[in-house]
Regions:
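Short, solvent-exposed loop/beta-turn-alpha elements that line the ligand-binding surface or hinge
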Residues: 105-120, 204-226, 280, 286-292, ...
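Extracytoplasmic/periplasmic substrate-binding proteins
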Residues: 30-32, 46-47, 51, 93, ...
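C-terminal lobe and pocket-closing loops
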Residues: 270-291, 302-403, 429-431
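Hinge/lid segment of periplasmic solute-binding proteins
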Residues: 90-144, 160, 169, 196, ...
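Extracytoplasmic/periplasmic solute-binding protein
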Residues: 130-139, 169-220
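Glycine-centered hinge/linker elements that transmit conformational signals in sensory
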Residues: 172-175, 214-245
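A structural signal for short loop-to-beta-strand junctions that line the ligand-binding cleft
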Residues: 84, 113-152, 182, 307-314, ...
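Conserved N-terminal structural module of periplasmic/extracytoplasmic solute-binding proteins
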Residues: 21-100, 110-116, 161, 332, ...
Length: 431
């Protein structure tokens, strides 16, 4: 990104959070939650909450389109010209730039004491720690691996939420026979394919997929081959809709599920606002052109290993924020970061984000119904008990897995051949 374009973005999207601040802290991001309209419809809600919590800090935030952000980050981090605070995806992005980031452990210990980790969900802190250094803090969590269902549709056909693999097949096919899409999936998109595959793999044999990523076991492990086989079967046994490989998760699947055209999908906690709040659902109704009120519910993926329990969610920080090691005002930057991470959690809770910190409930004041409240409370319990992560550390493995899943879906590879492809990529990774 050239200098002119960066200044153009600054001129167009600069947001100053305080006119009386004593210290200026710069923050660059692609998903600047501190800039968002809050769940009460107030476009300045997060701004005002930040100013109230940090009256002596002026936060200068620049929000880039994602592609431009990645390009800008690559240049600024390596040249020491980055902003004081930067947003990161955990996994490969955070690992790539970890060496240019401040270790936040001393700041956390000073702020919250020696047991500061107890304040956070452990699954979040584990993923913002690289080579023993706390290089970022998780802002909110995205938990995936859930089966979202429309209870209204299931009730119409006297069906129950599937609790195991055979029931999943049966329910999907009964709905199909009645002209309703059972489980809809946007297999065109790799990101949701990863989510579904991780969910299947963890349900069959928890943690094996992470051991394979770490290089401790082969990707041809029996449980991973089995997971790949089940993934492939979904395209032929009636669980997935016809044409799944041509559908995107957004808007195709989201629209079909939300508007009552599909009874089930897999999705994550980021979907809460548009489904379970009056404000968000009214926006969905307006966008998708429907008026019906549905009962949406959430549970884990159906049992596939025969233990009688549904799958557990897995989670990663939706956004993590790090501090540049080259920042010239680190104490002020920490003050701003602390507010974004801790003090604004109640603001994020209004939008039904899962907190990165322990003991922060959803704000259910705008929930659409008691059924929605029950679903959200159940989801929060699952999220707090989440096992494992969403993001892969190594881009080589991620790319190979995406190709492998596509090849199995179209019948070009067997499950074993697909996992051999991923294992070959895994062996090239320098860990």
């Amino acid at each position: 990104m050239n200098l002119f374009f960066k200044y153009f973005i600054l001129a167009c999207s600069l947001i100053l959070f305080s006119n009386t601040s004593k210290a200026e802290v710069t923050y660059s991001c692609w998903n600047c939650m501190t800039l968002d309209t809050d769940a009460e419809g107030n476009p300045n809600g997060a701004h005002e909450d930040f100013n109230a919590a940090a009256p002596n800090v002026k936060l200068v935030a620049v929000q880039y389109p994602y592609g431009d952000y990645v390009q800008s980050l690559a240049l600024s981090m390596r040249t020491g010209t980055s902003d004081d605070l930067m947003a990161f995806q955990v996994g490969s992005m955070l690992s790539t730039y970890a060496e240019y980031l401040e270790d936040l452990t001393p700041y956390a210990e000073k702020e919250w004491g020696a047991n500061w980790k107890d304040k956070f969900l452990s699954v979040g802190i584990e993923q913002t720690t690289v080579d023993g250094r706390l290089v970022a803090l998780p802002q909110v969590m995205s938990a995936a691996g859930a089966l979202w269902y429309n209870q209204t549709i299931l009730d119409k056909y006297d069906l129950s939420v599937p609790t195991n693999w055979d029931e999943w097949i049966s329910v999907s096919n009964i709905l199909k026979d009645n002209g309703v899409v059972g489980f809809m999936h946007g297999a065109k998109d790799s990101w949701i394919n990863y989510d579904l595959f991780i969910g299947i793999a963890n349900e069959l044999d928890p943690g094996k997929i992470y051991e394979a990523e770490a290089g401790n076991i082969s990707w041809t492990h029996d449980s991973l081959v089995k997971a790949t086989s089940l993934w492939g079967e979904m395209f032929s046994n009636g669980i997935m809709q016809e044409g799944a490989l041509g559908n995107a998760q957004y808007p195709d699947v989201h629209q079909a599920f939300t508007s009552g055209k599909a009874a089930m999908m897999t999705m994550g906690t980021w979907n809460n606002f548009s489904t379970f709040t009056n404000l968000g659902l009214n926006g969905s109704k307006e966008s998708y052109g429907f008026t019906e009120d549905f009962k949406y519910g959430i549970t884990g993926l159906p049992d596939m290993n025969g233990d009688g329990k549904h799958g557990r969610l897995f989670a990663s920080p939706d956004v993590s924020i790090g501090m540049s090691a080259s920042s010239g005002n680190k104490e002020e930057a920490w003050s701003a970061l602390k507010v974004i991470i801790e003090d604004l959690q109640s603001t994020y809770a209004k939008d039904l984000w899962v907190s990165s910190m322990n003991g922060v409930p959803f704000d259910l004041s705008d929930a659409t119904s008691d059924f929605a409240k029950e679903a959200l409370n159940y989801q929060l319990g699952m999220a707090e008990n989440a096992y494992g992560k969403r993001e892969f550390i190594y881009s080589e493995i991620k790319a190979a897995l995406g190709d492998a899943l596509q090849n199995v879906a179209v019948g070009n590879m067997s499950a074993l051949e697909a996992m051999q492809l991923v294992e070959k990529a895994s062996q090239t990774v320098k860990r």
